[in-house]
Amino acid sequence: MTQTLLLTGDMNFQGVTAPDTIFAKVADALRDAGVVFGNLECCFFERQGHDPGEREGFYAPPAAATALANHDAVGCANNVTYGEDAVMASVSRLDQVGVLHTG
C-alpha cells in the first residue's frame, strides 16, 4: 500500500482573518494525502502591547489555527521569539484543533 507524505513549509498566519481560505486552492491535495506535515513559523497567541501596524511578527491570532484543518502535524521548534507563554499557548491551541506537533 502506498501512502503520500505531503510537506508544507514556513507557514506564518500573522494577520489572517479568514483561515478557511488559506489552503483553499490545495485543499483536495491536502485531504487526499496520507500524512500532511508542515513547518509552523508562528505562535498562536494574542500578543499584548504591540503596535497594530507592526509588520514584524511570528505570531497569529488563535483562531488562525483552524487553517491547519487538513494538516496532521507541524514542527514548531523555531517558534521561540515570544517566550514560553506564547509557545505553550500555541501548543495548547494546536491540541484544541487536533494538530500533532513536535519541536
Residues of each region from the PLM?
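Acidic, metal/ion-coordinating pockets
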Residues: 1-103
